[in-house]
Amino acid sequence: MRYGYFDDKNREYVITQPDTPLPWINYLGSEAYFGLISNTAGGYSFYRDARLRRITRYRYNNVPLDFGGRYLYLRDNATGAFWSPSWQPTRTPLDSYTCRHGMGYTIIESANQQISAKTLYFVPLGANLEIWSTTITNQRDTVADLSLFSLIEFCLWDAWDDATNYQRNFNIAQVEIEDGVIYHKTEYRERRDHFAYFACSAPLAGYDTHREDFLGPYRGWDKPVVVERGESANSEARSWAPIGSHHVKLTLQPGESRRIIFLLGYQENPRDQKFDPPDSQIINKRLVKPIIAKYLQPETVDAAFADLRAYWDGILGIYQVDTPDMATNRMVNVWNAYQCMVTFNMSRSASYFESGVGRGLGFRDSSQDLLGFVHQVPARARERILDLAATQLANGGAYHQFQPLTKRGNDAVGSGFNDDPLWLPLAVVAYIKETGDFDILNAPVPYENKPGTETPLAEHLERAINYTLNNLGPHGLPLIGRADWNDCLNLNIFSDEPGESFQVAPLKKDGKVAESVFIAVLFVLAAKEMAALSDKVNQRISESANQVLPFAIRHSHFYLDAAAKMEQTIWAHGWDGAWFLRAYDAFGEKVGSHECAEGQIFIEPQGVAIMAGLGLDDGRAELALASVKERLATEHGIVLQQPAYSRYYLHLGEISSYPPGFKENASIFCHTNPWIMIGEAIVGHGDQAFDYYKRICPAAREGISEIHRCEPYVYAQTIAGRDNPRHGEAKNSWLTGTAAWNYVAITQWILGIRPSYDGLQIAPVIPMDWQGFTATRIFRGVTYHITVERQGGGNTVSLVVDGKPVEGNIVPLPA
């Protein structure tokens, strides 16, 4: 069943009925001001940090679902009937409805009682505000006497405190109203230098800022007393719950339209200029008033929206393909690339499954997100790399998470997730291959953001490698610490306290026994990439006469020797006969072995081992892939492990706390599926790689939306596995490493167009029934027009560049 369709020309997904299985959302903003918006105008906004700078309030797990957002109410003043153009919150049946989610914008259009409403929501580039551009049209043959009410609910800034500390928060809310603009200034009188504002372009018949006066006692958003009676209370919030609502009266002739613009924004003042007059408690509005005046002008709004569309045309134009498969084209050309931008901005902080109050930006998560984003805005990728490295510990370890507003490590979670450091070298290598910016290696970066501790980024990478080498267990494999990539495989926690967080629970074991085969294969991959980087750096130095070594980087022999030694250890202690083991627990017993009663085979080490080159020369790579296909593959994707854990195992931790088939306990954890796709491509299995790609491809699953339930235009983190009655149902959409890794799998390994130090590599491994494809790739400022034609049954490439044969499969960089 479909709830909409892809509008490929406009790069939009068009939702045609409001009651989708779950809220189908979009993101507004791409720089500092962000918003989440659902197909019925639910969601919230924040500045930089979804916890510490939450602008509007949102209640997760609410009943009814997705109540609270950017709401408009239309009222027919002649009859008293009112409705929501976005369907929610009144849920009045509409005569027509569409929601168009586009690149950084959403358009909701509907009609009821021959009155149509169309609202465009977006965040202008370079502005810390969002625009609601609303057009109301009278389609009747008589005059329409209407009232339009806007509504947002302000959050008291810290979203966690806002949702928990009522004894204080019911007493602190403050607003100002001036020239029809509602200013939210809670705590501005003391510690804060920022405020929010809500403005309207039309003359007002009234306003409200106090929730209870707007709604009425014991009423909800679906039936506000102010809208019901058609008159605002002109309330001013003094404590309790502050809101923003404008009342605009409209008299429309037959066929007449009226455009009203609403602005919701964030503003900071210099601390010594907070008040005007200085000795008052009145917000200094000298800086914000010109901004409000500018963006309330229709011509400014139209120009800003055109700029946003052009911005995304440029971003998406960096990589465009035309393949025989429509779902692939949609994901590569538009939706997967778009999701990579969103995950770069959000990491795992704010979605409809992540409340924005806990995780901030993850070290591992953000390092992987860079892999699918680095070609889009390299300058921002560079900045993120340096921010990540600055949270690294002096011993090479890393904070698991850091807050985007402060860029400091999260002490509550801390470090000890022992795979974290190894993702940084992979991110840096991807960045340098894309940009050729070797100078980043010489950038001075502190540890734990402590001034005076700076070393070149190259040394941070070396310390990341050494962190693994300095933390090996009894078999010579890396110690797992608190966890590795699978945060729920907690081999040292032994938690038996109800409600205790596995991520912050104290270690019950000393951590000197439990080892991770996954970290071992990841280490081999990272060490080999560091060796190749070292060789390239030394080559550049040797080719530049009299050049002083600009940064310190170990010789490639160091990394190759470390990788070779780890490979020997893996074959001795990490191979189970037909697949790679997952780990050794705190008692030295195998995890992910045929000897185990449950959890005999895990997906994670299989694909990454092949990416690291293990087993390619002796058939064991193909044997591991065959085991994955036989034991883990389902019609909806590849499950994380089998058999699922049927009960809680104290020594395994959170992974066994989930019911079978959900999350880390044998769901289709989509993040890991592209590792297998890449592995299949590396061994030359184009059909199998693409088959796995299509199984979890959102656009290919659009026809089973009643089963999949999440958005058909973006990846979800997890799909219920075959051990669960809800097999095929997705959860945790949008913010997942699945986005970056699937983008890498399809664009760089199946289509085979990937950056290298020396040029653009063309090495497709496509399905046998494809006769070829075309692509456009902008790489280091040069536009490459690529035509791939199948001339046989293999994957060997004969490269022709500008009409001339070129040896190998790398298009050399222009002279």
Locations of regions flagged by a protein language model:
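Anionic coordination/interaction segments
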Residues: 1-364, 379, 384-387, 391, ...
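Active-site acid/base region of carbohydrate-active enzymes
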Residues: 320-334, 383, 388-397, 423, ...
